[in-house]
Amino acid sequence: MLYWAAVFFIIAVIAAVLGFGGLVSASASIAQILFFIFLVLFVVSLIFGVVRRPGPPR
């Protein structure tokens, strides 16, 4: 999924350089969706990292 985020980021940069045509709205909305997906995954992994701390060795 990170690969696709990088691909859509590159598409967004190319579209910005070419003058913000019709491609921008599609790539920007996909990039925005991917941003929120990765933000949620980050928060979930952060919570699981705090909750699943290993106890002291026995």
Curated annotation (Swiss-Prot):
Database matches in Pfam families: DUF1328
Keywords, alphabetical: Cell membrane, Membrane, Transmembrane, Transmembrane helix
Subcellular location(s) of the protein: Cell membrane
TM regions (residue ranges): 4-24, 30-50
Membrane topology: Multi-pass membrane protein
A GO cellular-component term linked to this record: plasma membrane
Entries under InterPro entries matching the protein: DUF1328
The protein's name in its UniProt record: UPF0391 membrane protein Plav_0056
Recorded family membership: Belongs to the UPF0391 family.
